[in-house]
Amino acid sequence: MIPGGGSSLVHAIKAIEKYVETAPKTNGHAATWADEKIGIDIIRKALEEPLRQIAFNAGFEGSVEVNNVKSKKAPHGFDAMTGEIVDMFKAGIVEPFKVTRSALQNAASIGALILTTETLIADKPEPKKDAPAMPGGGMGGYDMM
């Protein structure tokens, strides 16, 4: 079990930032690092999104709560019921590690597939039709006397 509510993902950003600090910046091509940096920024934002959405759904400012969790050490996270930063294990807000790992692996796999595919095909959304008008008021002769 790992801390739930997206807090584990937010705390994982610290490892990504450590990688950014220590990674070679050129690999022989300056453009390569620029492309990698864009990918890293996308992953960083994606890892924040579950917590941001949970906070928003609970009526809080998501970005503020993400920063609050970032400033704490694991296993602290955002408790949407109380609006406080708590020890997620003590609060009982946990999730299975395997589920989170599988979600991240599947997302990475799909991302890699999109990057290596030359063409993507998607359905064009059909315009939504207005609902039919409601029938007129009561039927003649059936009203109350």
Task: Walk through the language-model features, giving the residues of each.
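Extended, low-charge hydrophobic alpha-helical regions
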Residues: M1-M145
